[in-house]
């Protein structure tokens, strides 16, 4: 196996807004390290051995990560642009129960960061897909590296403003820079 490590961004998106945020975060991360981006429905259930940073994000539904029922409700209200059967909640449930990755590394050697999208006009309401995902990842033995980030859409279907896309790219750059610095110090 190569000594080159990489980041993996796993996201859920129904209307394309969270996918745009994930892509911007990925672009920022690529300033520091090779980075792969994959939707939750195609994400590996065992974290590859060369991944040292896992970034997970999705839309906030009913104050948390989406559920099959909240995704169905969203499908009933609007046309979705991406498959919605597997969200980040289900993907996290499918992560292998084994505490090691395919290379035998402990999950605690993989840093994680989480993000979500939320409707701007209810930004002050409690609950967040990112914070919920971080709790699950911590329980699974991953090391939460940086606080969660929320990015705001005007309505549930969007649009997402360019300022939020740019903010996501900068967050990805910062995340990559901080992670590269912590890996060097370790």
Which residue ranges define each predicted feature?
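A short beta-strand-loop structural module common to alpha/beta enzyme folds
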Residues: 32-44
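Glycine-rich phosphate/pyrophosphate-binding loop and the adjoining helix
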Residues: 138-186
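Short histidine/acidic/glycine/proline-rich micro-motifs that form metal-
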Residues: 15, 118-124, 153-155
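Residues at the starts of beta-strands that form the adenosine-phosphate
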Residues: 5-6, 34-36, 111, 143
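Helix-loop-strand module that forms the ligand-binding subsite of alpha/beta enzymes
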Residues: 41-140
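N-terminal beta1-alpha1 ligand-phosphate binding loop
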Residues: 2-32
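Hydrophobic alpha-helical packing residues
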Residues: 25, 29-30, 136-137, 142
